[in-house]
């Protein structure tokens, strides 16, 4: 579930800068559109006719006013705005209108693109790189893009993704029949690993049942997987959470793939098997995660070979589809959700620089704002037990059918993902609770999991304990006729108790995405928007877009709830 960067609550000042950058980009496009005398689509979605010079000036002023209004807004994000602006603009006018500074910003946001431009230009000179940039297609520029300098990870270049069975940006967005993009046979898949052709690197299969090898993976991820843009926080994937996420039912040792240089583990990628439901079709697939390359090796283009090798190993098992997520724009997201954060220990989050204090407020007020009751209020609320699993499995199965993109769990998987087993893990990772009514029926459940972040070089605090919203379900969703108001109230009651329980277990912040029915309770429970996005991708499967729970302005959309019901760790 975490993106490939540490999402944090939005700083209003940064949001304003992002909006201004978007406005600047749109203004840069305007003169070229005016000079061409062609029709241009206005901000209100209607075509504006290019008329006389005076009309052009009037339209230009109108455009500037709209851009000014946008720059004052704190609702847009750089990633959504810039990619949308580029994708919808006329390619020639959009690229020719960019200043050298704006081009450099795009290159800085996209390490894979930078490598391709250097190779294409045959020179490290700035002018040559700029000219190579202007020759690209819009979709090539978008591929690998990340907002605000985040995700400085090489997730493979646009040239690589153009060769893969994934939907491309330049395909028409019309409604189409969903299904596999490429049909293959196991006998056509090579037995041997993808050639590395890079001495002294070699492929290895990591045995995560071996404590030493597990610690190697943990160390690599800690140092090189996720870090926020300012290098203030770093995700700390413990042995317990790695066992939980990478050794789920049906896991295969061969799907834990590493690259060594000598004895040093310098790259890793993993997958676990999962059934994926896309609307009315169930796919035998895999969940790919933890693509990590040592920072010093990011220029070696190891990402494409890691992706090819994990794909080869999965294909050898007769599995052809996969689901994966990331904060980077790749061809082509089936859905995009936004991160939201709810402070549980606001004072600590403020001290470490995670939560900003609004300019019109004071720390003492923020502490009061996020204070929680000591006791939960839902009658019959208790921890999940083994005896509850059949009922919870049935409830979750029915609840997930309300969404378009979900996992399909069997009883064993439900137990693995939701039940804490004290004898299996050194620390508790998953926290699950049920509501039992007077008759003994399980009517609701919710869950969240632990992912700790190290606070780098802070004199007082060394870690942040973050709770991530996992799966939940309630019988209230199945009342006839459907009562959205009742569902909203029930979810708010449950999530208010989830916050209290997380606080009781010494969590500092509660994180959630805009997926499932979360839009019904996030703002009401004082979750604030984060600066992180999570894009959902399907490999070798073409699916129509699925709503991510936010509108075009990147705000929660209570009227059109998310179709995503897949929570990835």
Swiss-Prot record:
<comment type="function">
    <text>Adds a myristoyl group to the N-terminal glycine residue of certain cellular proteins.</text>
</comment>
<dbReference type="Pfam" id="PF01233">
    <property type="entry name" value="NMT"/>
</dbReference>
<protein>
    <recommendedName>
        <fullName>Glycylpeptide N-tetradecanoyltransferase</fullName>
        <ecNumber>2.3.1.97</ecNumber>
    </recommendedName>
</protein>
<dbReference type="InterPro" id="IPR016181">
    <property type="entry name" value="Acyl_CoA_acyltransferase"/>
</dbReference>
<dbReference type="InterPro" id="IPR000903">
    <property type="entry name" value="NMT"/>
</dbReference>
<feature type="compositionally biased region" description="Basic and acidic residues">
    <location>
        <begin position="1"/>
        <end position="18"/>
    </location>
</feature>
<dbReference type="Pfam" id="PF02799">
    <property type="entry name" value="NMT_C"/>
</dbReference>
<feature type="compositionally biased region" description="Basic residues">
    <location>
        <begin position="55"/>
        <end position="68"/>
    </location>
</feature>
<keyword id="KW-0808">Transferase</keyword>
<feature type="region of interest" description="Disordered">
    <location>
        <begin position="1"/>
        <end position="82"/>
    </location>
</feature>
<dbReference type="InterPro" id="IPR022677">
    <property type="entry name" value="NMT_C"/>
</dbReference>
<dbReference type="InterPro" id="IPR022678">
    <property type="entry name" value="NMT_CS"/>
</dbReference>
<comment type="similarity">
    <text>Belongs to the NMT family.</text>
</comment>
<keyword id="KW-0012">Acyltransferase</keyword>
<feature type="active site" description="Proton acceptor; via carboxylate">
    <location>
        <position position="569"/>
    </location>
</feature>
<keyword id="KW-0963">Cytoplasm</keyword>
<feature type="binding site">
    <location>
        <begin position="291"/>
        <end position="293"/>
    </location>
    <ligand>
        <name>tetradecanoyl-CoA</name>
    </ligand>
</feature>
<feature type="binding site">
    <location>
        <begin position="299"/>
        <end position="303"/>
    </location>
    <ligand>
        <name>tetradecanoyl-CoA</name>
    </ligand>
</feature>
<dbReference type="GO" id="GO:0005829">
    <property type="term" value="C:cytosol"/>
</dbReference>
<feature type="binding site">
    <location>
        <begin position="158"/>
        <end position="161"/>
    </location>
    <ligand>
        <name>tetradecanoyl-CoA</name>
    </ligand>
</feature>
<comment type="subunit">
    <text>Monomer.</text>
</comment>
<dbReference type="InterPro" id="IPR022676">
    <property type="entry name" value="NMT_N"/>
</dbReference>
<dbReference type="GO" id="GO:0004379">
    <property type="term" value="F:glycylpeptide N-tetradecanoyltransferase activity"/>
</dbReference>
<dbReference type="GO" id="GO:0072657">
    <property type="term" value="P:protein localization to membrane"/>
</dbReference>
């Amino acid at each position: 579930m975490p993106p490939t960067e540490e999402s944090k609550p939005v700083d209003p000042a940064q949001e304003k800068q992002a909006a201004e950058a978007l406005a600047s980009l749109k203004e840069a496009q305007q003169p070229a559109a005016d000079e061409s005398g062609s029709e241009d689509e206005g901000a209100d979605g209607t075509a504006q006719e290019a008329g006389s010079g005076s009309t052009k000036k009037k339209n230009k002023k109108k455009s500037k006013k709209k851009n000014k209004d946008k720059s004052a807004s704190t609702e847009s994000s750089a990633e959504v705005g810039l990619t949308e602006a580029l994708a919808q603009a006329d390619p020639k006018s959009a690229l020719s209108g960019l200043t050298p500074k704006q081009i450099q910003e795009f290159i800085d946001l996209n390490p894979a693109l930078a490598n391709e431009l250097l190779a294409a230009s045959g020179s490290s000179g700035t002018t040559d790189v700029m000219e190579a940039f202007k020759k690209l297609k819009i979709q090539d520029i978008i591929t690998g893009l990340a907002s605000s300098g985040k995700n400085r990870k090489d997730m493979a270049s646009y040239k690589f993704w153009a060769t893969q069975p994934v939907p491309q940006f330049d395909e028409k967005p019309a409604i189409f029949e969903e299904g596999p993009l490429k049909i293959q046979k196991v006998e056509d898949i090579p037995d041997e690993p993808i050639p590395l052709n890079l001495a002294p690197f070699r492929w290895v299969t990591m045995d995560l049942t071996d404590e030493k090898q597990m610690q190697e993976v943990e160390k690599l991820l800690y140092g090189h997987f996720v870090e926020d843009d300012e290098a203030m926080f770093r995700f700390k994937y413990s042995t317990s959470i790695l066992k939980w996420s990478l050794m789920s039912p049906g896991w295969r040792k061969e799907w834990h793939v590493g690259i060594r240089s000598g004895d040093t583990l310098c790259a890793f990628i993993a997958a676990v098997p999962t059934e994926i439901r896309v609307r009315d079709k169930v796919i035998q697939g895999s969940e790919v995660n933890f693509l990590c390359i040592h920072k010093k090796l990011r220029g070696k283009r190891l990402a494409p070979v890691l992706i090819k090798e994990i794909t080869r190993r999965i294909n050898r098992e007769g599995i052809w589809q996969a689901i994966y997520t990331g904060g980077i724009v790749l061809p082509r997201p089936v859905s995009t959700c936004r991160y939201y954060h709810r402070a549980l220990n606001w004072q600590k989050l403020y001290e470490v620089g995670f939560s900003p204090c609004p300019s019109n407020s004071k720390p003492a007020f923020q502490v009061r704002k996020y204070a929680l009751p000591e006791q939960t209020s839902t009658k019959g609320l208790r921890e999940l037990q083994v005896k509850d699993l059949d009922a919870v499995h049935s409830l979750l199965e029915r609840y997930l059918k309300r969404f378009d993109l979900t996992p399909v769990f069997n009883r064993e998987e439900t137990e693995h993902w939701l039940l804490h087993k004290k004898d299996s893990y050194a620390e508790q990772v998953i926290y699950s609770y049920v509501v039992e009514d007077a008759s003994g029926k399980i009517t609701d459940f919710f869950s969240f999991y632990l992912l700790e972040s190290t606070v780098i070089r802070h004199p007082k605090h060394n870690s942040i304990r973050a709770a991530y919203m996992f799966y939940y379900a309630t019988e209230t969703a199945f009342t006839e006729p459907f009562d959205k108001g009742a569902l909203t109230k029930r979810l708010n009651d449950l999530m208010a108790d989830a916050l209290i329980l997380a606080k009781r277990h010494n969590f500092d912040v509660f994180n959630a995405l805009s997926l499932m029915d979360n839009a019904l309770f996030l703002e009401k429970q004082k979750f604030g928007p984060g600066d992180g996005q999570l894009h959902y991708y399907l490999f070798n499967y073409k699916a129509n877009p699925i709503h991510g729970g936010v509108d075009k302005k990147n705000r929660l959309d209570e009227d059109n709830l998310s179709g995503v019901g897949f929570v990835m760790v």
